[in-house]
Regions:
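Short, surface-exposed beta-strand/strand-loop-strand elements in extracellular ectodomains
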Residues: 75-88
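Noncatalytic modules at the cell exterior or secretory-pathway interfaces
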Residues: 103-119
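Hydrophobic beta-strand segments within beta-rich accessory/binding domains
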Residues: 55-74, 111-113
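Beta-strand-rich interaction surfaces with strong enrichment in secreted/lumenal proteins
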Residues: 42-44, 55-58, 99-102
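N-terminal prepro-regions of secreted/extracellular proteins
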Residues: 1-42, 46-47
């Protein structure tokens, strides 16, 4: 009889311990698994005093992961602008900068070279990593 009680108590203690460990884990829906897309930005050319979309538009539904861009020209890096579609128009969410990165939230985005202030054309190529 003592052996049955010991086994029952031991089994109950083990199950209670396991139940406590299971409830201490975060729920699966609280994890943030953002799919990322990466690739090359096709080589191209932006004429003098022109602006050109060089990547996008692309849609992000998971807004907690960073966007990363790297754009190079013949003589080094090229400043680019990240824009987001807001109220039916494109709004710049970064200033013209080299290799913009950041958590911009969810939405629809594009990457632009603004060459409107220059009298020389720019050639470019690049790469990206963006959340989906």
């Amino acid at each position: 009889m003592l052996t049955k009680k010991m086994i029952t108590l031991t089994l109950a203690a083990c199950l209670t311990s396991l139940a406590g460990a299971a409830t201490a884990q975060p729920a699966a829906n609280t994890f943030n698994f953002c799919t990322k897309k990466s690739g090359a930005i096709s080589s191209g050319h932006v004429g003098a005093q022109q602006e050109k979309v060089i990547y996008g538009p692309y849609k992000v539904t998971c807004g907690t992961t960073s966007h990363h861009f790297n754009v190079k020209g013949a003589s080094g890096q090229v400043p680019v602008i990240v824009q987001q579609l807001k109220n039916g128009g494109w709004a710049s969410i970064t200033a013209a900068t080299y290799d913009p990165s950041g958590r911009f939230g969810a939405g629809i985005f594009r990457l632009v070279i603004d060459n409107r202030q220059s009298n020389t054309s720019v050639s470019y190529t690049g790469a990206f990593v963006v959340p989906m």
